[in-house]
């Protein structure tokens, strides 16, 4: 499944799908760009994985609602429930281990 961009109109719907990795990022954040490449590589390796990205600059209300205070922040959801989170860039194996 391709990496999907989320916004306030579809975020809650997207995180309700089975297991989802949500990447909260900022437009000018250099570490976010590095992590984006890591997610692209993981998606290529595991194409059935649900990965969504939410731009916190363009969607500050969603970022506030989910307690995002720094980027990148990665949330892991199972059937809409937060099961794990991480602030900062994660190494590929750490993402896969969740």
For the regions a language model picked out, list residue spans one by one.
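Conserved hydrophobic/aromatic "anchor" residues
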Residues: 11, 24-25, 66, 77
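Non-catalytic, surface beta->alpha helical segment in thiol-disulfide oxidoreductase systems
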Residues: 76-98
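Structural micro-motif
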Residues: 66-75, 93
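Short cysteine clusters
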Residues: 29-32
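Thiol-based oxidoreductase modules, predominantly thioredoxin-like and allied folds used
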Residues: 4-6, 24, 36-61, 68
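N-terminal leader/targeting and pre-domain segments
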Residues: 1-18
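Short acidic active-site motifs
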Residues: 10-11, 58-62, 94
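Short active-site neighborhood of thiol/selenol oxidoreductases, capturing the structured segment around
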Residues: 15-27
